[in-house]
């Protein structure tokens, strides 16, 4: 299957009102797919992107199953982000929510699942360089976000091993036009952040267009090679 010959698909983006979710949904709509967004809030800007919005809770099994009916690909970008909140909130959204998405995909016969994770699942407080998907998880995690995202991606990988065509992506510190978090935080704290190390420390970041396109390419490749 080539990009020029691919048939339009019906897809669902969880967390479609978020920074990454909206970018993924917009790109999908722009290439001709029928796109549904699933999230708790109202997001009028999605209509301008050609996206149909379904309002629902990520931990609501019935709502998710209804949203997945007739859908071929699910992009699961919804998550509770760091850094604040009780562990129970992270578990509900990131762990229970992902379990509900997987179950809905199975019941509705969804063909492919693309799950957004994070490199934080590998972070143990030490520098990470040259890591890949074979790098093992740390003995413990330093935040509820990392711990619950690790549990979530393990659920997806287990579902994939059991036959659901699924893939996990780990973009880091996504930024770009419309960024509500990364760059604004840096600018707001300019000259007030504590310096760590000798000033030569590196951090990987992901531009929003690249992150969104990676999700589309992952789904397309998964369609070519479900195994």
Regions found by a protein language model. Give the residues of each.
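Active-site segment of SDR-like NAD(P)-dependent oxidoreductases
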Residues: 80-81, 119-123, 135, 172-175, ...
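Alpha-helical substrate-binding/gating segment
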Residues: 187-193, 203-227
